[in-house]
Amino acid sequence: SAAGSEPERKLSAEEWLETLPERDYTGYVFTLATTETGFVVPAEEDEPGLVDMAAVKRNELMAAKYGIEVREKALKTGTLAGELKTARTAGTQYADAVLAPARDLAAAAAAGELLNLYSLPYFDLSAEYMTKPLSTDSVIGSTCYAVFGSATGAENSAWVVYYNRTLLDKAGYDSMEKLAASEEWTLGKLREIAETVAAETMDKRSPDSSHDIFGYSSYYNDDEFLLSLWQTSGVRAFGDSAGQPLELRYDYEKAQSALDTLGAFLDSKAMFPASGQSALNAFGEGRLAFFIYRLDFASVLAEQDVDWGLLPLPALSADGEAVSPLDGLTCGLGVPVLQEDSERTGILLNAFFAASHAHMRQALMNNYVHFYLSDNDQALMLERIFDHVRADAALLYAPGYTNIAAVSSDLLTELLRNGGSLESRLEPHLASFENFAKTNFR
C-alpha cells in the first residue's frame, strides 16, 4: 500500500468465519474435554464476566455458522493420556478436541494419543486469526501436537513481574512502568534495583527471612521458575524449530553466559531464601521488592493488603528481546487420534479459533484491567506482556518425552542450581537424542 494510506483493516471474528468453508453440521454436538471447567462453555450467570461473555459469543458464532452446539466435558488434570487410551481401546471418540495443560498434552502426545495437527484436514495453524507467533512455537519439524493462544487462555500463564510500589517508591524508583518500557529493562537492572532496595540485608552474614527486606522471589522457587528465567535469555534448545528437523541448536557461548548470569541472580542475597506462603507474606508485608510469577496470580495478590504494580519480565540482556514465557501449566488444544470425522474436526477447530479471534484476547486483557490494575500505565504494561507471550517447543514437550527433557529442562534446571558447563554436560546425551530425533517430530 502507498505511504500514508490507511493501515490494513483487521477482520472481525464474524468476518473471519465468513472466509471458512460452508458445511451443514446441524445437530452435531462439538465436544471439548477440558481441565478448565467453564472456560469453553461458561455456567449461566445473572452477571457473566468479560471472559465468559467472549466465550459465549464464540460459541454462538460457531452455532450460527455450522448449526452445532459446543459442549464441555470435564477432564481431571493429569489423566488425559489414560482417558484417551481407554476411549481409543474401546473404539470410541473421546472428544473432538481437548483443552489441557501443556504437560498433560505432552504426556498424551508421547503416548501416541494425539494427532499431529498438520495431518488434520483443513486445520490451519498459520491462519491470521491464530495468536502469532505463539501458535507455531509448539511446532517441531512438520509436527505439532498442541496449539496455544488467546482462545486457549494461554496468556493467563505468562510469567510476569509484580513490584511492591511502596517499597520501590521509598527507594526512589517511582516510575517503574517508564523503565520497563525502555531498553534499560533487563534482568540485570531488576537485580540492581533489588540489591539496592535490600542493601542492608545484602550486608548481613545470615539474613532473617521473617524480618529483613529482600529483592525478589517467586511463589515456588521450583523448576517452572528456573525455566521461566531461562526463557528470558532467548536461547532455545531447538532454535526456531518450526519447519526445521529436530536437532539441538544451542548457541553454546550465549547459553553458557546466560546460565552463569542466571546462576548469579539465583545466588544473590537479594533472593528470598524461602518460598510459598512465606514469600507471599513477605511481599504482602512490604519486605520484598519483586515477585516473579504467573499473570493469573494477580487475583491472589489482589486479596493482599499491598500496593503492587505489574511489569513484563525483562530480557536477560539489552540486546535480547523480552518474552513473557509460558510454563507447563499453560493450557493448549490438542486432538485425540481417534476421530469419527477428521475433516469436520478440522473445519470446526478453525471456526473455534476464528470465532475467538481478537475479542477473546481483548476480554482476557479487559478482565485484568478491570479487576486488578490501577491505571493506564498498568494497562500498557499488560499489553506489552500479551504482545510478547512465547513458548519454547523443547520445554512444552519435555514433560512427556524423557529424551527431550534430558537435553533441555532437566539439564538446564540442574545447571541453574549447581553450575557447570552446558556443552560438556550435554555430551553424554547426544547419541540417544539423535536416535530419538530420527523417529520423532519428523
Predicted regions: what they are:
Residues R191-A194, L227-S275:
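Glycine-centered hinge/linker elements that transmit conformational signals in sensory
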Residues Y122-Y129, A180-S182, V235-A255, A318-S324:
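Short, solvent-exposed loop/beta-turn-alpha elements that line the ligand-binding surface or hinge
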Residues E8-F30, T35, K76-G78, A102-W159:
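Hinge/lid segment of periplasmic solute-binding proteins
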Residues A302-V369:
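Extracytoplasmic/periplasmic substrate-recognition and gating elements
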Residues P42-G67, T166:
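Short, polar/charged alpha-helical segment
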Residues V337-G346, S356-R442:
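Conserved C-terminal helix/tail region of periplasmic/extracytoplasmic solute-binding proteins
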Residues G78-L115, Y129-F148, G188, E192-M202, ...:
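Pocket-flanking alpha-helical
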